[in-house]
Each structure stands twice: as C-alpha cells, then as structure tokens.
Curated annotation (Swiss-Prot):
Organism: Coxiella burnetii (strain RSA 331 / Henzerling II)
Keywords: Aspartyl protease, Cell inner membrane, Cell membrane, Hydrolase, Membrane, Protease, Transmembrane, Transmembrane helix
GO cellular component: plasma membrane
Active-site residues, as the UniProt record annotates them: 123, 141
Pathway(s) per entry: Protein modification; lipoprotein biosynthesis (signal peptide cleavage)
Keyword Transit peptide: no
Protein name per the record: Lipoprotein signal peptidase
Pfam families in alphabetical order: Peptidase_A8
Primary role: This protein specifically catalyzes the removal of signal peptides from prolipoproteins.
Location (main, coarse): membrane
Family that this chain belongs to: Belongs to the peptidase A8 family.
Superkingdom as given in the UniProt entry: Bacteria
Molecular function per GO: aspartic-type endopeptidase activity
Localization per record: Cell inner membrane
C-alpha cells in the first residue's frame, strides 16, 4: 500500500519548537547571569538588561493587579491554535508564509510558557541610542515581529486568486 505524502506545512512546526527552545534558553541564561535592572553593555547601542514584564508589548497593562496575565496567556494560546490550524492548511511550498507562521507560533508559545510558569515574561534585549531606549524585549518577541513582517511581505507579493 502506498501512502500519500502530505504536502502541507506541518514540518515547519519543528521551526516553532526551535524558536521556543532558543527563547527559553536565552531567558534561562538572562535570569542566571544578569541582575534585575542592571544593564550589561554588549555594543554601543545594545545592552542586556533583565526585566520582568507582566503586561504585553511595551509593558501594556503591566501595572494592573494580575488579571492581565491570564488575559495575555489566553490570547497567546488561542492565537497559537489558530495559527497552527492556518499552518496545517498552508502548502509546504509557501516558504515565506510557513516560516512567518512558524516564527509567530514559536514566539507566542515562548511567552505563553513564561506567563504560565512565572506570571511574567522575561525581557532582556535593550536597544538604545544614547539615553533613548527602545522597549526591552526577548527572542520570542523578535520571532513574532519577524514572522509578522514575513506574512505581510508574502501577502503583498503573492498575487490574489480572487477577481
């Protein structure tokens, strides 16, 4: 009996797993080698500064009394399920789409794990120009941003089949 080989993008989920592993390893190292709020200069424009974020991007809702942790964890989980389903319906040959979805899934689940384990997300990457600092972020956040960028580029460059 010959089995039909799947042409769907399921194998790209391994890339999501890699993103999760890199994210969790980098956060483990940040927690063990950095001190909260004490920057370590890496480059003239880059510090590693340990920060715990109970909110979302740019610490949105970070000062609330705790409900936001459950809220953002639930959003991460639901979005990840939706994106996994989307990836399951994507052709393996759509590399940019598959890679973008995989990056977003990995990033969302990396931060989801932090919220479940610690009730906050560990951030440590601190880009700055002199005294101006961008919001501190992590590997998962980077994966999400790159993934969204790839999806946008894919959607702009792929001709629509609709009239």
């Amino acid at each position: 009996m010959v089995t039909k080989k799947s042409k769907k993008a399921w194998p790209w989920l391994w890339f999501s797993v890699l993103v999760i592993l890199l994210d969790q390893l980098s956060k483990y190292l940040a927690n063990h080698f950095l001190s909260l709020g004490h920057p370590v200069k890496i480059l003239p424009f880059l510090n590693f500064t340990l920060n715990y974020n109970t909110g979302a991007a740019f610490s949105f809702l970070g000062t609330e009394n705790g409900w936001q942790i459950i809220f953002f964890a639930a959003i991460s989980f639901v979005v990840s399920i939706f994106l996994i389903l989307w990836l399951s319906r994507t052709s393996r040959s759509e590399i940019m789409m598959s890679l973008g979805l995989s990056l977003i899934i990995g990033g969302a689940l990396g931060n989801f794990i932090d919220r479940l384990r610690w009730s906050y997300v560990t951030d440590f990457i601190d880009f700055h120009i002199k005294d101006w600092h961008f919001a501190t972020f992590n590997v998962a956040d980077s994966a999400i941003c790159v993934g969204v960028f790839l999806l946008i580029v894919h959607m702009l460059l792929t001709p629509s089949s609709k009239p």
